[in-house]
């Protein structure tokens, strides 16, 4: 009887434990596979996340652009400072920007000291030249030399005493009791005695000699 029942069950399909286990294993495998398939779409960002990421990227790009513009401004400033340094290499007139004027008093003994007066005038300094201790001929030569240099520099000259002269650059105005001295007063050169060897004979004198 048992054999008949078992055969009948086998024929009907009631005794299929293996198939049930196989189906169970198959369903269990599908359960393991299905969560993986569900996790895969979860990795795709949603619209809100994409918008937030886009905002972050826009902010990052704006920050980068601001940094680049700041760097560009700094570059321009550095370039301008570089130009300022180049301009600082240009030598200006001494004493013209500091608002201070300087007066140099010279009491030369020889004519070889006269270039000091010209050098001081080129440095925009006034010169008081005291020639009382010099030989008269050397003193006249010194005055002519310094006066020529002052005239070349568009300066001014004024006699302030016996053998004492004031030479000023063009940036200095000289005022006296009579008024403002705008033009350079030339010194009176000493009359030169013509050399007898270079005397020019007049036609009448030549006729008398003949």
From Swiss-Prot:
Protein name listed in UniProt: Cell division protein SepF
Keywords: Cell cycle, Cell division, Cytoplasm, Septation
Function text: Cell division protein that is part of the divisome complex and is recruited early to the Z-ring. Probably stimulates Z-ring formation, perhaps through the cross-linking of FtsZ protofilaments. Its function overlaps with FtsA.
Record localization: Cytoplasm
Oligomeric form and interacting partners: Homodimer. Interacts with FtsZ.
Cited InterPro entries: Cell_div_SepF, Cell_div_SepF/SepF-rel, SepF-like_sf
Keyword Cytoplasm belongs to the record: yes
GO BP: division septum assembly; FtsZ-dependent cytokinesis
UniProt key word Cytoplasm: yes
Family the UniProt entry places it in: Belongs to the SepF family.
One GO CC term on file: cytoplasm
Organism of derivation: Trichodesmium erythraeum (strain IMS101)
HAMAP family named in the record: SepF (MF_01197)
Pfam families given in the database record: SepF (PF04472)
Low complexity composition-biased segments: 36-47, 59-69
Region (Disordered): 36-69, 182-210
């Amino acid at each position: 009887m048992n054999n008949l029942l078992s055969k009948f069950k086998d024929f009907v399909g009631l005794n299929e434990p293996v198939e049930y286990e196989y189906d169970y294993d198959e369903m269990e495998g599908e359960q393991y596979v299905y969560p993986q398939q569900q996790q895969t779409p979860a990795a795709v960002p949603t619209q809100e996340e994409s918008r937030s990421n886009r905002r972050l990227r826009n902010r990052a790009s704006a920050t980068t652009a601001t940094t680049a513009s700041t760097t560009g401004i700094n570059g321009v400033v550095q370039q301008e400072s570089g130009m300022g340094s180049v301009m600082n290499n240009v030598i200006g007139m001494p004493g013209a920007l500091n608002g201070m004027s300087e007066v140099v008093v010279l009491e030369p003994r020889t004519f070889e000291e006269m270039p000091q007066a010209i050098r001081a005038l080129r440095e925009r300094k006034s010169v008081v030249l005291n020639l009382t201790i010099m030989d008269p001929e050397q003193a006249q030569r010194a005055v002519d030399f310094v006066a020529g240099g002052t005239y070349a520099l568009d300066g001014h000259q004024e006699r302030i005493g016996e053998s004492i002269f004031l030479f000023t650059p063009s940036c200095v105005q000289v005022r006296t009791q009579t008024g403002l001295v705008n033009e350079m007063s030339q010194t009176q050169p000493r009359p030169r005695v013509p050399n007898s060897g270079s005397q020019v004979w007049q036609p009448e004198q030549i006729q008398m000699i003949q």
